[in-house]
């Protein structure tokens, strides 16, 4: 119950067609007809519709169970997958696009792992290739004064909340459902930190938006879709 992959599947809002279509449109445009590498491919929420758009997709994922669910879907057998840690795993060939969506960068729970992820991506990108990350802006401003817990969902069936350690940038997602409790660790990250990680990997910021429909990223944005380019 407590794995990141299980909770990913339970987050039904990310499967809304509008959200998926906007992200797929954004990625297909950046791919320019080349190959795409998805880090944390999971069950193919993005990879399958992107492949149907004519973009060859290869994925990396640590969860064999998630990949099995991808394989069971129409078109899933046509997508190559490497089983491994997407922060360090290497695959054959180069790509015009690599992407990491739905806050998955935060599943890497140390700064070292996130830096390694950027370097791994840079090693796979062709010159001019792009790396895309979709991630929420840390919600610290929503915390009540003096508190470190932020509720997300409260109902008779389920309670979901996050706790933050501002000294370490550690974050935990907490879920209580049907009498069971689970918790998942994350490491929250700011956009400026991601820009520095990209710089360390030899990439530079190309564009940053509030979402896939290219709304401007502003001080009140709750997420960002950022693109870094390999020279």
What residues fall within each predicted segment?
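C-terminal lobe and adjacent flexible extensions of AdoMet/dcAdoMet transferase-like proteins
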Residues: 193-231
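A short glycine-rich, Lys/Arg-flanked "PGG" loop and its adjoining helix->strand segment in the class I
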Residues: 115-127
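SAM-dependent methyltransferase
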Residues: 132-199
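Conserved class I S-adenosyl-L-methionine
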Residues: 1-32, 34-42
């Amino acid at each position: 119950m407590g794995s990141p992959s299980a909770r990913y599947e339970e987050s039904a809002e990310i499967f809304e067609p509008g959200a998926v279509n906007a992200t797929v449109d954004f990625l297909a445009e950046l791919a320019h007809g080349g190959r795409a590498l998805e880090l944390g491919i999971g069950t193919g929420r993005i990879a399958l519709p992107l492949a149907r758009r004519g973009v060859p997709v290869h994925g990396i994922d640590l969860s064999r169970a998630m990949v099995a669910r991808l394989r069971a879907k129409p078109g899933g057998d046509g997508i190559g997958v490497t089983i491994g840690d997407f922060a360090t795993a290497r695959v054959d060939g180069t790509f015009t696009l690599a992407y990491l969506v739905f806050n998955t960068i935060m599943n890497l729970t140390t700064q070292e792992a996130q830096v390694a992820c950027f370097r791994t991506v840079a090693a796979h990108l062709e010159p001019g290739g792009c790396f895309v990350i979709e991630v929420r802006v840390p919600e610290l401003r929503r915390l009540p004064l003096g508190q470190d817990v932020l509720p997300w969902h409260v109902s008779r069936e389920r309670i979901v909340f996050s706790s933050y350690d501002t000294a370490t940038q550690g974050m935990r997602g907490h879920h209580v459902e049907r009498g069971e409790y689970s918790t998942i660790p994350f490491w929250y990250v700011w956009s400026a930190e991601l820009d520095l990680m990209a710089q360390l990997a030899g990439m530079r910021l190309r564009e940053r938006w509030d979402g896939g429909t290219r709304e401007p990223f502003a001080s009140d944005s709750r997420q960002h879709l950022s693109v870094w380019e390999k020279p």
